[in-house]
Amino acid sequence: MTFQVECVESRTEADQGQYGRFSIEPLARGQGTTVGNALRRVLLSNLEGTAVTAVRIGGVNHEFATIPGVREDVLDILLNVRELVVHAHSPQPQIGRLRVVGPATVTAADVDFGPEVEVINPNHYIASLSEGATLEMELKVEWGTGYRAIDRSHDETTALDFLQLDAVFMPVRRVNYSVEDARVGESTAIDRLVLEVWTNGSLSPQEALSQAASCLVALFEPLKNVSVGSTHTADPEPTPESQTPIEDLQLSVRAYNCLKRAQVNSVADLLSYTYEDLLEIKNFGQKSAEEVVEALERIGIKLQESKVS
């Protein structure tokens, strides 16, 4: 059964967000819920978007400061900047710059991002300046998916005087779906899927739906070539080096104790970890992980780069 997708309603909201309502039919009984749930999850979680991730403000080195002649404090300005909706045409991080002298009302339209970044909500309010006040800012824009909280310990690309923001990359704000009864000829055991999509304006609902469908196709594509035969492979013979207890690796007390608490007793146990896995061990920092990598290299062993699926 071949179904059709029709956009039955679309509009642009007052805040430049976009809305689209789609009808997908005919679907076999039960497929409406299956397709609707899968699309909703991907639309809300897996689509890439751009967001302002860090801000540098002239004369400011922490978020609890105030700026002479500016009505908002720095924390309020950061919250306003976080609500900027932008769309970058380049995968590389971009920098936008702003310099306004009061009296003035500062909006997103005052930020100069250059040709690589489009501001979707240029009327978005940022701050108010009194006579003689000056506001200078640099805004960093990046691509990402989902939500990224501030993580100062792992950000090596942002200068120290940039104030980081919790970044919301999701271009889709909300998704609803419902399944209705439909008819094809004499058959009434047919589903009609009605899908509603709200975006922030950086992506149209039609584009969002297309990207979500592509994500699902890519996800299921490998299942087309599943081998019928046995996929079991014999475990490799353990090498003498893999049987080395971690006591012989001459690790620091901190690294050794963390590994022991994680039930890592030998090099063979370590080989089931990637570098990223080591960083997830409680109290096991980057310095300890580098120490383990160097110790393994001394005996001719390297950690696996990724989990074997």
UniProtKB/Swiss-Prot annotation:
The keyword Nucleotidyltransferase applies. Its EC number is 2.7.7.6. This is DNA-directed RNA polymerase subunit alpha. The keyword Transferase applies. In cyanobacteria the RNAP catalytic core is composed of 2 alpha, 1 beta, 1 beta', 1 gamma and 1 omega subunit. When a sigma factor is associated with the core the holoenzyme is formed, which can initiate transcription. The gene is rpoA. Keywords: DNA-directed RNA polymerase, Nucleotidyltransferase, Transcription, Transferase. Residues 1-227 are annotated as: Alpha N-terminal domain (alpha-NTD). The N-terminal domain is essential for RNAP assembly and basal transcription, whereas the C-terminal domain is involved in interaction with transcriptional regulators and with upstream promoter elements. It comes from Synechococcus elongatus (strain ATCC 33912 / PCC 7942 / FACHB-805) (Anacystis nidulans R2).
